[in-house]
Amino acid sequence: MTTHTTLRAANVARQREWDKEGWIDAAYRGNELAGEVGEACNVIKKLERERHGIMGSRATVGELADELADVIICADLIAMQYGIDLDAAVARKFNATSEKVGLDTRFQPADR
């Protein structure tokens, strides 16, 4: 079982608890994802600010890890809503980009 497969199972179970009425739709999910991407970008800005010695608030790589995890969770929730197999989609897109730009590296999910 891949990490993504395990995440999907956990997302399915948690959504039954979180959204008992089933009202969360794709528009909500899209806004949720955008918010999490924005939070990740804000942490990156703070990390870069510190790297360049610019005054202002700081962040940690641990905070970035948390925000990126939220992005992945939200992306999976959207994929779940539309019945998308993210393992297959990621491999397909990664490999298509490699082919398009003439690179040899290909991605194959571990359990395929």
Give residue ranges: language-model regions.
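Flexible "arm" and connector segments at domain edges
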Residues: 1-112
